[in-house]
């Protein structure tokens, strides 16, 4: 059944939403009604079975004590409990000041030994009765969450039309837990100031599947996703790989679902994969677009470029070391050749000196030979003169001898 609520001004509606978000149910026990630990007794098996039957009956009755405020086709924004009736508010509803549900006082249930129903619970204490009421309230909320999950699974199993799109489907309602009191509005200024005052801390977290380390800002963003049925996180890369291989994500805790949640500082987003297409060229096209349009101020690209330059620098340093080694060897050869050249110059100077000495000696010998030849020529001339003179003397003597002989 739906309930009509009188309209109010925007300022009053915001004030009333804040008052609703602060509503709670407090269970208090009077001091005289609290028994000591020694006086508590364990209930018998018959009382436990009786309580289970009563709990099932109250669970069936609790389904009738539910009132819905607003349009049921809109998402559930808040829920609260008052005087045995659970109220579910759907969508943005302005509640007037005259509504009795807007009492600023909390719903306090005082439980003592006098107001416990002894006919239904003859052997139960006030504390156990209070725990039973809290358990029944938690069971009702768990039942509502189960119904929401069943509705979501039925929507997934139901056949879809070719034009189905979850982003624009008017019948797709995101299930929310009745325990969530916060509306999908922007955070209040006090919350924003508190978030701004918190220091940002970068934390390195690793994936339990691929062991890749990511650096995220604590309580601000996250590179991990979780299933809608558990809180075990994996990186988005591993989630996509599992969905690509199996079409369904199964956690190591046996929770199976294809939907996942992505978190940031404002909340989380639930999404589910619609279509899985296996095409190896799509990632290449995607990377071409990334390299063309998304690498202008990319720190990773700069790091890759710096790494490439460092590699080139290392290669150039190695080549420079080789050139320096060759230069050292050439300098050594040059010094050795220089020493050889100096030795050759010394040898040449010595040879030149020896040549000069030999030339000088040769000139002296030539002079001596010339002198000897001159002396020999003079001696030959003298000898020829003497021989001529001897020949004349001999001729004269022969002629004289012939003359003497002829006279005889």
UniProtKB/Swiss-Prot annotation:
Reaction it catalyzes: S-ubiquitinyl-[E2 ubiquitin-conjugating enzyme]-L-cysteine + [acceptor protein]-L-lysine = [E2 ubiquitin-conjugating enzyme]-L-cysteine + N(6)-ubiquitinyl-[acceptor protein]-L-lysine
EC number per UniProt: 2.3.2.27
Record's compositionally biased regions (Basic residues): 13-25
Disulfide bonds, paired cysteine numbers: none
Comp. bias regions, Low complexity: 30-47, 183-197
Signal peptide: none
Post-translational modification: Auto-ubiquitinated.
Region feature (Disordered): 1-67, 176-199
GO BP terms in the entry: regulation of viral transcription; symbiont-mediated perturbation of host ubiquitin-like protein modification
Keywords: Activator, DNA-binding, Early protein, Host nucleus, Host-virus interaction, Metal-binding, Modulation of host ubiquitin pathway by viral E3 ligase, Modulation of host ubiquitin pathway by virus, Repeat, Transcription, Transcription regulation, Transferase, Ubl conjugation, Ubl conjugation pathway, Zinc, Zinc-finger
Database matches in SUPFAM superfamilies: RING/U-box
Protein's cellular compartments: Host nucleus
Sequence repeat residues: 34-41, 42-49, 51-54, 55-58
Region (2 X 4 AA tandem repeats of R-R-Q-E): 51-58
GO CC term, one of those recorded: host cell nucleus
PROSITE patterns found in the cross-reference section: ZF_RING_1 (PS00518), ZF_RING_2 (PS50089)
UniProt GO MF annotations: DNA binding; transferase activity; zinc ion binding
RING-type zinc-finger residues: 207-255
Superkingdom field: Viruses
Ranges of biased composition (kind: Polar residues): 1-10
Protein task: RING-finger E3 ubiquitin ligase that plays an important regulatory role during the initial stages of infection. Migrates to specific nuclear foci early in infection supposely to prepare the sites for viral transcription and replication by targeting and ubiquitinating host proteins. Acts as a transcriptional activator and activates a number of viral promoters including itself, IE1 and the promoter of 39K gene.
Similarity comment: family membership: Belongs to the alphabaculovirus IE2 protein family.
The name this protein goes by in its record: E3 ubiquitin-protein ligase IE2
Organism whose genome encodes this protein: Autographa californica nuclear polyhedrosis virus
Chain's gene name: IE2
């Amino acid at each position: 059944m739906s309930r009509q609520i009188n309209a109010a001004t925007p300022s009053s509606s915001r004030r009333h939403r804040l008052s609703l978000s602060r509503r709670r149910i407090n269970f208090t026990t009077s001091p005289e009604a609290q028994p000591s630990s020694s006086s508590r007794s364990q209930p018998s098996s018959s009382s436990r079975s009786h309580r289970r039957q009563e709990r099932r009956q109250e669970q069936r009755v609790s389904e009738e004590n539910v009132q819905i405020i607003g349009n049921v086709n809109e998402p559930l924004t808040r829920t609260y409990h008052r005087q045995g009736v659970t109220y579910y508010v759907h969508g943005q509803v302005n509640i007037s000041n005259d509504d009795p549900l807007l009492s600023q006082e909390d719903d306090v249930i005082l439980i003592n030994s006098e107001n416990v129903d002894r006919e239904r619970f003859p052997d139960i204490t006030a504390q156990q009765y209070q725990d039973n009421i809290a358990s029944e309230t938690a069971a009702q909320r768990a039942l509502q969450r189960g119904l929401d999950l069943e509705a979501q699974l039925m929507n997934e199993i139901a056949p879809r039309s070719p034009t189905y799109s979850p982003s624009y489907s008017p019948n797709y309602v995101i299930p929310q837990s009745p325990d969530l009191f916060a509306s999908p509005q922007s955070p209040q200024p006090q919350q924003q100031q508190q978030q701004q005052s918190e220091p940002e801390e970068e934390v390195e977290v690793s994936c339990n599947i691929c062991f890749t380390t990511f650096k995220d800002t604590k309580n601000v963003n996250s590179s991990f996703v979780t299933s809608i049925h558990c809180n075990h996180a994996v990186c988005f890369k591993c989630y996509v790989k599992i969905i690509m291989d199996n079409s369904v994500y199964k956690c190591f805790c046996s929770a199976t679902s294809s939907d996942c949640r992505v978190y940031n500082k404002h909340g989380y987003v639930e999404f589910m994969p619609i279509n899985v297409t296996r095409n190896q060229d799509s990632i290449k096209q995607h990377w071409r677009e990334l390299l063309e349009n998304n690498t202008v101020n990319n720190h990773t690209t700069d790091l890759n470029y710096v790494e490439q330059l460092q590699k080139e620098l290392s290669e150039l340093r190695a080549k420079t070391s080789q050139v320096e080694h060759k230069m050292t060897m050439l300098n050594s050869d040059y010094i050795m050749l220089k020493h050889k050249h100096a030795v050759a110059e010394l040898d040449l100077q010595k040879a030149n000196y020896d040549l000069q000495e030999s030339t000088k000696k040769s000139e002296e010998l030539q002079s001596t030979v010339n002198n000897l030849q001159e002396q020999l020529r003079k001696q030959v001339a003298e000898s020829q003169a003497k021989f001529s003179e001897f020949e004349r003397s001999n001729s004269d003597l022969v002629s004289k001898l012939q003359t003497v002989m002829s006279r005889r």
